[in-house]
Amino acid sequence: MSHPVVHFEVVGKDGKKLQEFYSQLFDWKIDANNPMNYGMVPPEDSGLGGGIGAGQDMGPGHVTFYVEVEDLEAHLKKVESLGGKTVMPPMAVPGGPEIAMFADPEGHVIGLAKAGAG
C-alpha cells in the first residue's frame, strides 16, 4: 500500500467517558496524560494505534482514520480536483505529526498525516 492508514480517531462530546468505554470494552491501555487529554491508544501486535478524545467544537463527534502522505498541501489540492473539500488545513500536532483533514464528495471526513513526522 503506497499510502498506509496510520491512525484512527474517535471523537465525541465526552472524551473521558469514551476513553473509559473503549478501555473497558477492548482492554485497551489508553494514555490521556497530555495537555489535550487526548487518549492515545498504542498499536499492539498486528493492530493500528489511535486516539480517543473530546472534539474542539463539542459537536456530535466522528470516527475517522488518517492516511500517511508525503505532501499534505499536494494531497489537499488533489482532493479538491476530485470533488472533495478541505475541512482542516495542515496543522502541527504538539509532539506529533503535521495533519490535515478533508471531506470526500459524499461528506466523509478523512485525515492525512505527513510521512516521517511525529
Language-model region placement:
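Conserved beta-strand positions that form and line the central face of beta-propeller blades
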Residues: H7, M40, G51, P89, ...
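Conserved acetyl-CoA-binding loop of GNAT-fold acetyltransferases
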Residues: L25-I30, G83-K85
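Catalytic core of tubulin tyrosine ligase-like
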Residues: Y22
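N-terminal beta-strand motif that seeds the catalytic metal site of vicinal oxygen chelate
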Residues: M1-Q19, S46-G47, H62-F65, K114-G118
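Conserved short beta-strand elements that form part of the metal-binding/catalytic scaffold
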Residues: D27-G61, V109-K114
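Vicinal oxygen chelate
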Residues: V5-K13, Q56-E80, L82-G118
